[in-house]
Amino acid sequence: MLVGLGIVFTVATRGVQFRLFGHMWHLMLDSRKQKGTSLSSFQAFTVGLASRVGTGNIAGVSLALIVGGPGALFWMWIVALLGMATSFMESTLAQIFKVKGKDGLSHGGPAYYIERGLGSRTWGVIFAALLVFSYGLIFPMVQSNTIAQQFKSTAGIPVWVTALVLVAISIPIMLGGLRRVAKVTEHLVPIMAIIYLLVSLITILMNITDLPRVFSDIFAGAFGLRAGLAGVGGGLWATMFNGAKRGLFSNEAGQGSMPNGAATADVPHPVVQGLIQSLGTFVDTIIVCSMTGFMILLAGPSVYTPGQELEDGILAQTALTHHLDSVSYTHLTLTTTPYV
């Protein structure tokens, strides 16, 4: 359904994610200078990016490649490009139907535009309850478990110790409210993203001569053109399905989480934040997920083969160790943990 909506929104907006792609970057970079009672567009962008970027970019990509083969990465790209239009629409709606709270911050999101736009308070409350349950309990457990397993495999730290540390770090930030969360993500997200991308680029440059083979495997696997590149279950459907599923899990376009952060921004026009949040989908999947995928595929059959039995998070660690030895364990763990 989310892929179908992405196609509909792409057609309806005449490919806004392609037509205004350069303008998105200009708006995002320029928004760092904003001042206002609510959050700046850049702060709202980093809050959204902190939610998107995390274990989905590591464990999610790894699982997509294990189950769907190299071609799954191609379908993650397609889903992300379509998802940019979905993200644009949901974030723009969040701005249109937002309300000003007593704390001076703007509040909005799907629950608000379901109530105020569709006139259904009941469905708005139901959506809000489901969102709180999903993002308050389920998704944090997935993220935290991946982090705990990484620390356990790299340093032998018990899972329960990592859990306590994560709680101790998170509580002061959350108790400070949205402004404190935004202040932290505004500085932390760019730094950690740059570190991850730099290490990824170093890995790619070390294996630059093998990059054509990686792209060949991705495109051949995406369309079932070569035997041995399909994942568990085999066939083109397994590749497409797993790529799309993991792509949506990673970039969260259309899931209803991003608009809540988008609504908090002070912008001159609702479309401005829609464009900026749309860029987050691109950064998450086309850039960060691709880096993880390239590092795994560049490691070759000694580390990765489609359909292999290996924990998804461990695959990324094994690939990084293959390229950069023990540095990779520290890098992967430390760059993932802050996003939780």
State the predicted function of each range:
Residues L27-L49, A80, S91, Q95-Y135, ...:
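Transmembrane-helix boundary/entry motifs in multi-pass membrane transporters
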Residues A44-S106, R116-S120, G274-P301:
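Membrane-interface helix-loop-helix modules in multi-pass membrane proteins
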Residues F9-T10, R52, S62-G68, A94-K100, ...:
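Helix-loop junctions at the membrane interface of multi-pass solute transporters
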